[in-house]
């Protein structure tokens, strides 16, 4: 065996000179083999043993094996062939698909005698190489295969149930969910942490107050509901995974949830940027009515879409204006007006000028970032205004007030002199 090792090494080096192309699965398998501590000689010896065992199986059961050659010392394409074969078997275990005919062997169930031969084969490998543990590896591979099948079936079952809930009456489902939360004693705050939807939004939706949840968030909520019903307590330790803002896949169906990853991946909305044409339309409607109803918001959204619509081109979901975005813009606009009014009132009061307080804004003007993911870049930046620019703005208002105060004092003195 040692005498054939230089020949095998030369053949392996010839493969490097030919620059073989390996798949990702093959590279992953090779890296995992190397991390186990096996040397090249041990790997080649194990592959030769597997070839011999496969040949014995094919001779015993009358089945032809296409494992890529009978010996690694006489073939010039043994290393890539063995890697391809290992890859094909791995793909068969994880995906349940039959490998390609060019680099596979028969994966059909063997008779009961195969198990006996398998135990003998494992004993042979164990005695020839102390670092290998074929029995343990075989058990792990079978566990991975069964788990992947169960996870996929469970995920498909959850998706079907979510689609069924989407077709049902929303009010009936809300009552079911409220009863479910009460019976399990699950707080809305915990649900908000898991799903990424704000607690206030969940509360308003369950109480049938305010606007309805978007289709994306409703699917996410129903998915959590189904997972929690199937496996109680499994989702409570999960947290929503962060999603890049530039990811355009938020409008697609949510990705499958992995029970082992510890995260509940939900697609979040991308920040919406208003165009100048739409802002002009929004301002005109805002001057008419600052609190439009749902029908009016739909009218405003259609007007904005008509302005930005190009002939022969359909607006994408990222470009289309919806009633929810209109609601968000109006709420931010009202907040901005009241914020500036509060600043001016505070400055006037600091100079002893009594003014009527503009009052606190209503709860309807509060727009939670988690409630409405499509934010307005033209107005939301005011909530995080730079302190320096705010100080300059306040100083300008202060200067104007002082100028008016001096002008009023001069007029009073002039009137007093005229009376004398």
Swiss-Prot record:
According to UniProt, the tissues expressing it are described as: Ubiquitous. Detected in pancreas, brain, spleen, placenta, prostate, thymus, liver, heart, bone marrow, skeletal muscle, stomach, uterus, testis, kidney, ovary, colon, lung, cardiac muscle and thyroid gland.
The feature table lists the DNA-binding region at: 267-341
The record's note on quaternary structure and interaction partners says: Associates with the telomerase holoenzyme complex. Interacts with DKC1, XRCC6 and COIL.
The observed outcome of changing residue 338 to A is: Impairs binding to telomeric 5'-TTAGGG-3' motif
POU-specific atypical domain span: 145-241
Q: Where is the composition biased (Low complexity)?
A: 64-73, 81-93
- Please give the annotated consequence of changing residue 335 to A: Abolishes binding to telomeric 5'-TTAGGG-3' motif. Confers binding to the non-telomeric 5'-GTGAGT-3' motif
- Give the compositionally biased regions (Acidic residues): 365-377
Pfam families from the UniProt entry: HNF-1_N, Homeodomain
Site note Critical for recognition and binding of 5'-TTAGGG-3' motifs in telomeric DNA applies to 335
Cite the HNF-p1 domain residue spans from the record. 18-49
Which residues does the annotated region (Disordered) include? 56-139, 353-385
User: Keywords on this record?
Assistant: Chromosome, Cytoplasm, DNA-binding, Homeobox, Isopeptide bond, Nucleus, Phosphoprotein, Telomere, Transcription, Transcription regulation, Ubl conjugation
Compositional bias per record (Polar residues), positions renumbered to this chain: 94-132
SUPFAM superfamilies, A to Z: Homeodomain-like, lambda repressor-like DNA-binding domains
What's the gene? HMBOX1
Q: What is the effect of changing residue 271 to A?
A: Abolishes binding to telomeric 5'-TTAGGG-3' motif
Residues where Phosphoserine occurs?
Answer: 148, 170
Nucleotidyltransferase as a keyword of this entry, yes or no, is no
Q: Does the keyword Glycosyltransferase apply?
A: no
Q: What is this protein called?
A: Homeobox-containing protein 1
Q: Where is this cross-link: Glycyl lysine isopeptide (Lys-Gly) (interchain with G-Cter in SUMO1)?
A: 413
| One cellular-component annotation, GO | PML body
Where in the cell? Nucleus; Cytoplasm; Chromosome, Telomere; Nucleus, Cajal body
At the top level, the lineage of the source is Eukaryota
Per the entry, what this protein does is: Binds directly to 5'-TTAGGG-3' repeats in telomeric DNA. Associates with the telomerase complex at sites of active telomere processing and positively regulates telomere elongation. Important for TERT binding to chromatin, indicating a role in recruitment of the telomerase complex to telomeres. Also plays a role in the alternative lengthening of telomeres (ALT) pathway in telomerase-negative cells where it promotes formation and/or maintenance of ALT-associated promyelocytic leukemia bodies (APBs).
């Amino acid at each position: 065996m040692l005498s054939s090792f230089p020949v095998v090494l030369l053949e392996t080096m010839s493969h490097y000179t030919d620059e073989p192309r390996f798949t990702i699965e093959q590279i992953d398998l090779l890296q995992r083999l190397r991390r186990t501590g096996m040397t090249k000689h041990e790997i080649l010896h194990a592959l030769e043993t597997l070839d011999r065992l496969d040949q014995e199986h094919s001779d015993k059961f009358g089945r032809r094996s296409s494992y890529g050659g009978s010996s690694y010392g006489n073939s010039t394409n043994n290393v890539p062939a063995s890697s391809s074969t290992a890859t094909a078997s791995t793909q068969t275990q994880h995906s349940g698909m039959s490998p390609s005919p060019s680099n596979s062997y028969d994966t059909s169930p063997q008779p009961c005698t195969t198990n006996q031969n398998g135990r003998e084969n494992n004993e042979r490998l164990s005695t020839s190489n102390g670092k290998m543990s074929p029995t343990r590896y075989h058990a792990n591979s079978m566990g991975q295969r069964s788990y992947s099948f169960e996870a996929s079936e469970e995920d498909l079952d959850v998706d079907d149930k979510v689609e069924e809930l989407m077709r049902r009456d929303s009010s009936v489902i809300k009552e079911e969910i409220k009863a479910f939360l009460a019976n399990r004693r699950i707080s809305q705050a915990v649900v908000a942490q898991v799903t990424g939807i704000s607690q206030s939004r969940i509360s308003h939706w369950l109480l049938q107050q305010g606007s309805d949840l978007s289709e994306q968030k409703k699917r996410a909520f129903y998915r959590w509901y189904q997972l929690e019903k199937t496996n109680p307590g499994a989702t409570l330790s999960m947290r929503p995974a962060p999603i890049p803002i530039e990811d355009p896949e938020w409008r697609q169906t949510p990705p499958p949830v992995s029970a082992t990853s510890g995260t509940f991946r939900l697609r979040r909305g991308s920040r919406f940027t208003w165009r100048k044409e739409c802002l002009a339309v929004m301002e005109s409607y805002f001057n008419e009515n600052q609190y439009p109803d749902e029908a009016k918001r739909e009218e405003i959204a259609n007007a904005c879409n008509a302005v930005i619509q190009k002939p022969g081109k359909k607006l994408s979901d990222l470009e289309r204006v919806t009633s929810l975005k209109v609601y968000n813009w109006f709420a931010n606009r009202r907040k901005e007006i009241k914020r500036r009014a509060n600043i001016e009132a505070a400055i006037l009061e600091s100079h002893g000028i009594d003014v009527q307080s503009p009052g606190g804004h209503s709860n309807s003007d509060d727009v939670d970032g988690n409630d409405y993911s499509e934010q307005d870049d033209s107005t939301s930046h005011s909530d995080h205004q730079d302190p320096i620019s705010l100080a300059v703005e306040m100083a300008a208002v202060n200067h104007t007030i002082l100028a008016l105060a001096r002008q009023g004092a001069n007029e009073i003195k002039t009137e007093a002199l005229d009376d004398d």
